[in-house]
Amino acid sequence: MALIVQKFGGTSVGSIERIEQVADKVRKFREAGDDLVVVLSAMSGETNRLIDLAKQINDQPDPRELDVIVSTGEQVTIALLAMALIKRGVPAVSYTGNQVRILTDNSHNKARILQIDDHKIRSDLKAGRVVVVAGFQGVDENGNITTLGRGGSDTTGVALAAALKADECQIYTDVDGVYTTDPRVVPQAQRLEKITFEEMLEMASLGSKVLQIRSVEFAGKYNVPLRVLHSFKEGPGTLITIDEEESMEQPIISGIAFNRDEAKLTIRGVPDTPGVAFKILGPISAANIEVDMIVQNVAHDNTTDFTFTVHRNEYEKALSVLENTAKEIGAREVIGDTKIAKVSIVGVGMRSHAGVASRMFESLAKESINIQMISTSEIKVSVVIEEKYLELAVRALHTAFELDAPRKGE
Amino acid sequence: MALIVQKFGGTSVGSIERIEQVADKVRKFREAGDDLVVVLSAMSGETNRLIDLAKQINDQPDPRELDVIVSTGEQVTIALLAMALIKRGVPAVSYTGNQVRILTDNSHNKARILQIDDHKIRSDLKAGRVVVVAGFQGVDENGNITTLGRGGSDTTGVALAAALKADECQIYTDVDGVYTTDPRVVPQAQRLEKITFEEMLEMASLGSKVLQIRSVEFAGKYNVPLRVLHSFKEGPGTLITIDEEESMEQPIISGIAFNRDEAKLTIRGVPDTPGVAFKILGPISAANIEVDMIVQNVAHDNTTDFTFTVHRNEYEKALSVLENTAKEIGAREVIGDTKIAKVSIVGVGMRSHAGVASRMFESLAKESINIQMISTSEIKVSVVIEEKYLELAVRALHTAFELDAPRKGE
């Protein structure tokens, strides 16, 4: 008999019919003998409706009061699911974040979980009840309602699994697992049976938005086995876990991630003096613009070029900040490009394999795709290319790294 | 500087515009120097929407879980009002029933308030904040969310006023006070400046649905001065208070209430033996049918007739129960009538005035209105008449008891 935490997102509980389907699924697990804690999001669209109500009062609504409103979304779904389970003869009880009690810090709208009281949940599980918990919300030490920020229900699921030392945290979504790359781009993409936390982090942050990145970090930190599954289709999904078996048979790379949401900015002819990177990125950061890749090459003629990428939505803003900076520090010019794409190969296997990057560059060269920027980490290599080559690049790499064929061990 | 509890109902907070108007009103009071606790209902229609969601899962939803859902309605409005106040530069904070903490028993969907912790509210008031509290909800000693039943926000307001020893509890509604009778029936109806708790109870239970009856009882018990006011019009409203000055100038009756929602049932030729009333009403009560008036006259020929009224919606059900009973106890026949109306005169003044009832009967006789049933209490006389005479009867009585003219002392 296992203890399983199951998390269903907004689409999975988006209507009464869907909630009834989730109840059927939960009942099946319960009848198989598992102890179950179910974490729910608000019905899809509901959180936006509530935020919109608040914004009709004030574009910048008071953060404490916003959490009071937004937290009602999950409060409705947990009670609906508990009712649906009770109707099926499955004893169940719902808890808000406050009732559990999921203690957070007091950063309204983006709170972090500090501690979970497992007392009530354990006693309900012992009494044979399914416990349905509101995701995305908690309470600070003064009893103020807090929320974890958008998508935070995944984090609630993982945190509960960690606190309860659950055997598995199952995240139900609208995909049946994590794939070697986006199947819409590469039809031969394969569902991965397993992936490590580190790989998943690189895949998620690079645009394979299956799981919320914070929840993966959290799961890795507390070593909670995470499984991504489809809400309404049968199948084993993908297990995200620690890297247990670094065997010969492990593929060199696990997947190919990509992202077309970025834009690139370059400031050229920057005097090559200490502190210049800060002078450039300081004002960007002060303007609340997030930077992804940063590349600076060695200087020549005492000047250097400095390039970074930002979200495409923030390109104009970043450009105007950077133009000011260029004047101040005496740089030659600022240029930018929004028609770029980032492609990354990810895999813990590359740690022990030399030549992974060169194999990547080689297969792009074969397709005559020019590489504009390169950055690397221990388990990934990312390149920026012209956007129109994105699909071609992903397909070429998918084949070059032997991801097309059904993989060994699967 | 007074401490005032203000309660706004669902219509008063039914849209963002209305909530902004309430915020303007609250700000004015605050700027005048009063300490304010504001109690809110859910937006009109929202509670029904939430109940409907629950009923889509189960016609008889689990009571605990229903409270979890339904309580979100007020949780949204309190935060919206707090935001609107903060936007206006008025420091404000919202609290759910659980956050206050309003402790209730565990009768879900119809809980009763046991105790209110005034600690947080007092410290907020001291800090100059307007405190916005969710009406209609509380929490039991195990932390389960409870609701007080439909319309319970009035009760929350009165209970808070009692706990805080507030100077006044103001109930904002869609009428500008309590009238001598329904102005739609008698255009000369007058707004009462004052009315006693007892009179208000009789008026409310008889169909002048301005205030929730439980809140009036509660206010009377704890002697909380209640004031009924219009949410969006200026005016002093009607003060409901204890009967301080039983002066000569006090009118004999304060108002005329009426009700067309009832139906009458008579069981005839009942053997006149002890216990027969219970044999008749026992099965009615067991069928969860509420009975209003009950009349039994003295027996003749060892049989008696027994008449009572029920809500018109329950007439058919009551009729079938009563026909079974008639067979069992050997009664002659069962007859009924749904085309009836009840008219009542209410006033503490009648205690010290003889002949009030006969004056009532006289003025009805003058209009040739036949009286079918009569029942009396210390401060009211009710009669049942044929429904079509209702307006005529109310107007005749309004004139007979001198309620048409502006009254002395106003």
Show the residue positions of the predicted features:
Chain A
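Short hydrophobic alpha-helical runs that function as membrane-insertion/retention elements
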Residues: E168-Y172, L226-V228, D292, M373
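Nucleotide/pyrophosphate-binding catalytic subdomain
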Residues: M1-V216, N297, T309, V384-E386, ...
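Acidic-aromatic/histidine active-site loop/patch
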Residues: A219
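A conserved regulatory-domain signal marking ACT and ACT-like small-molecule sensing domains
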Residues: I57, G237-E410
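Conserved beta-strand segments of alpha/beta enzyme cores
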Residues: P91-V93, P225, E290, N370
